[in-house]
A protein has these predicted regions:
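C-terminal catalytic-base region of ester-bond hydrolases, centering on the histidine
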Residues: 142-203
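Proline/glycine-enriched tight loop/beta-turn segments at coil->beta junctions
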Residues: 2-9
Length: 203
């Protein structure tokens, strides 16, 4: 077992009601520091499709964008963090993703999901079968560099502590609004630091 400090392509996955445009500042910052940054629009982005179907879009994007076996890193914001986890834990992403960074992701659900009657929102309700299944083997994420970044003031992830997980690294930031997380300079620099962290390779 050894460590390597690779600089992989980075794929940014947005949240519900968002587009890839929400990562404008983060993308510019990372590109300015030498990263090959990718993002695309999940479709539909308003919760009509299940998160598992959205995760398939990551698979399709990766297959058409990168050569076979090319490792890459994932950054998922809000719902995008759960979609990214599903790709890693259920769709074979564990073989290619070396770093996964979840920003304000509802790992254990958000009570606000009860106010939106769609499949995607249902899959983000606390104690729902989808999240219970995904969290059943959350220790899988210990096989990669996993980082959770969250704010205690998050009014979209209720409770905000739903963004905490018992694996990987945790970064707590005093950002006042959910949507500000991906624009806040402290969060962007925390993402850069996590992307620079050496990965452990099992021989």
């Amino acid at each position: 077992m050894n460590q390597t400090q690779t600089r992989n392509p980075v794929v940014l996955i947005h949240g519900i009601f968002d587009t890839a445009g929400i990562f404008r500042l983060m993308s510019a910052y990372l590109r300015g520091r030498g990263w090959d940054v990718h993002s695309f629009n999940l479709c539909p982005n308003y919760g009509l499709a299940g998160l598992d179907r959205l995760a398939e879009q990551i698979s399709h994007y990766v297959e058409k964008t990168f050569p076979p076996g090319q490792p890459f890193d994932l950054v998922g914001f809000s719902m995008g963090g759960i979609v990214s986890r599903y790709y890693v834990q259920r769709l074979g992403g564990l073989d290619r993703v070396q770093r996964l960074i979840a920003i304000s992701a509802p790992h254990y659900g958000t009570w606000l999901a009860y106010f939106y009657p769609t499949l995607g929102a249902f899959q983000m309700r606390p104690y729902c079968p989808f999240l219970c299944d995904l969290n059943r083997d959350i220790e899988t994420l210990d096989q990669i560099n996993f980082t959770s970044i969250w704010t205690p003031f998050d009014a979209m992830i209720l409770p905000a502590s739903s963004s905490r997980v018992p694996v990987g690294d945790e970064i707590l930031l005093d950002v006042l609004l959910h949507a500000w997380m991906v624009r806040d300079s402290r969060c962007i620099k925390a993402v850069e630091k996590a992307l620079r962290a050496p990965v452990t390779i099992n021989n």
